[in-house]
Structure formats: C-alpha cells, structure tokens
Design a protein with these regions (language model features):
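Active-site phosphate/pyrophosphate-binding segments
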Residues: 55-214, 253-288
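Short, structured coil segments at secondary-structure junctions
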Residues: 4, 86-87, 232
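Glycine-rich oxoanion-binding loops at beta->alpha junctions
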Residues: 2-32, 41, 48, 197-201
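Short beta->alpha connector loops at strand-helix junctions that form conserved
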Residues: 11, 37-38, 92-97, 239-242
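A short, gly/pro- and small-residue-rich
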Residues: 48-60, 225-236
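Short glycine-rich anion-binding loops that position phosphate/pyrophosphate groups of nucleotides
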Residues: 38-42, 75, 218-219
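Structured mid-domain segments that build the active-site/substrate or prosthetic-cofactor binding neighborhood
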Residues: 190-202, 211-248
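Extended, hydrophobic alpha-helical segments in both membrane/secreted and soluble proteins
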Residues: 19, 35, 42-56, 69-71, ...
Length: 288
C-alpha cells in the first residue's frame, strides 16, 4: 500500500510484429519479465520466454539476465525448472488445485496487482467479504454467486445462451477476463454460454431474443440503455461496483456463478478438453 505504480504490459500474442513492438517499448535494463504459466508447457509462453531470455542474455549477459525474470507456475513444471537453472530473481509457486482461468485471486493475478500499486490487503478483504456470503450455509436467495449462476444457467436452458456484458468505460477490461472464464468453463459437450464482450449495441427492439444482459455499473453511464433493454422485454441484470477494489469481489462472484451455471447446464466447469486438444495439436504442428 502506498507504493508507486509501475508500468505493466501484458503480452498475449505470438504475432512477430507485436512481440517486437513490445520488446522495443521495454528497455531490458529497466524491465522485469514475468513468466506466468501453470503447466509451464504452454507453447506460446515458452516461445515468449525463449525470445526475451535470449534477447536479454545478448544484451546484458547471462549472469545478469536472470535478475530480470520472475516465474509464476505450479510446482514441478518446466518453467520452474528453467527458472531455477537460470537463477531467476524469484520463483512463485501457485496453488496447483486452482485452474488457470480461476486463478485471478492467487499469485497469477496478485503479482501484477501489486506491481500496479494496489493495496493487496484491501483487495483481498473485498474478495473475502463476497466469499463469506457465498458459502453453502448462506440461504440461496442471499447468496450472490449462486443467484447469478442460477440465472445464467436457467437463462441458457431457456434459449438465452448469449451473455452480453455491459460495462462503464472504466471497467471495459473486465469483460476480456469474464469472457474466457465463462466460455472456457461452459463450452463443451455441445452445450455452453456464449459471452459477448465489447459489442456494438443494437436498438433494444432489434436485439436478439437469445440474449441475457449483465451491466457492471460503476458510473451509471449506461443506465438509460439498460432501462430501454428492460422496457423492451430483455432480461438485464445490474451489478453495482463501488470502486476498483470491488472488482476482486466481482471476480469471486463470477467464478462461483460460472461454476453454478455449469452445474445447471450439466457440464464440468473445471475441465478443458478442447483446450488440451488444441495444445496437443499445436505442439504436434511445431514438432512436424
């Protein structure tokens, strides 16, 4: 708390032009590279590590390069082995029982939050507050994660399986995280909820009848639009967000809700058969 925020850039593309652009914007002598991978074997992460490690070794020398890298990974992974062999500045071992898309409130999300200058104590307190009212002992009607999840699941079964997330401008980035969480958890066995993020809004009367709208409300800039959707007969939920620290509670709410929605749909929220298949195919292509 009180520490100055650092510039944080997230590289999630293997496009050579974007990788080179990211490298040019970050002078290696002043850059800390965070290598984040639960399994450690993800091809894209390994490609990024190889590129930036070799580049840093060439620029700073092998003895200094390791001080510019930190790894977040599961115990026993390839990345842990590489990090220790190369003498990374630190190796942070995450909880192996938490799946990748559910890991925003463990080390994978907490380290970037710390670098951005967030008060981690307050961040976790907000999440813990939501967790307390999401326990199985809390009556269903007062359990925010269960209520949202039940609505998502039942709406999907009723044909409203497209989930449109509406946010005020300050919360736009939340949609990218929520999109992966919902899609990767629910989309399997011919079932699923399709999240729609950053969508050009149609007039309420022209919006498809297969939609469920959820508005993450911080400033109220979309109040009028949401009222029009509701007046046109579209289900539109409003989730109030007080400030940036409330996002940790929303992360927890959406994780619980996604698991509940998947249970309603009859799919396993925590496996990822298509993801594993895609990883296998990618590795086969690279090896060919």
């Amino acid at each position: 708390n009180g520490r100055p925020a650092l510039d944080l850039a997230i590289l999630d593309s293997t496009d050579p032009a974007q990788v080179r652009s990211a490298a040019r914007r970050a002078p290696m002598a002043k850059t800390l590279y965070i290598v984040a991978s639960k399994s450690g074997s993800t091809s894209e992460t390994q490609a990024h590590l190889a590129y930036f490690w070799n580049r840093t070794v060439r620029g700073l020398g092998k003895t200094k390069a390791g001080n510019h890298f930190v790894a977040i990974t599961d115990s026993g992974s390839i990345v842990e082995k590489q990090a220790r062999e190369r003498r990374f500045r630190d190796v942070i071992l995450a909880d192996p029982n938490v799946g990748g898309r559910y890991s925003a409130l463990i080390a994978f999300g907490m380290l970037p939050a710390a670098l951005l200058g967030l008060d981690l104590k307050l961040w976790l307190e907000r999440a813990a507050g939501l967790m307390k009212v999401s326990l199985p002992s809390v009556p269903a009607a007062r359990n925010p994660g269960l209520v949202l999840g039940a609505i998502l699941g039942e709406a999907a079964l009723a044909g409203r399986d497209k989930l449109t997330l509406l946010t005020d401008e300050e919360l736009t980035a939340f949609g990218a995280w929520q999109e992966q969480l919902v899609a990767e958890s629910s989309g399997k066995n011919g079932k699923g909820i399709v999240p729609v993020d950053v969508e050009t809004q149609l007039p309420p009367r022209n919006s498809p009848r297969d939609r469920l709208f959820v508005y993450m409300r911080l400033t109220g800039s979309l109040d009028a639009q949401v009222k029009k959707l509701q007046a046109a007969g579209h289900p539109a939920l409003v989730l109030p967000v007080g400030d940036v620290y409330d996002l940790s509670a929303e992360i927890y709410r959406w994780e619980v809700a996604t698991a509940i929605a998947c249970a309603v749909l009859g799919v396993n929220a925590f496996n990822q058969p298509d993801v594993q298949d895609n990883k296998k195919r990618t590795q086969q292509k690279i090896a060919a």
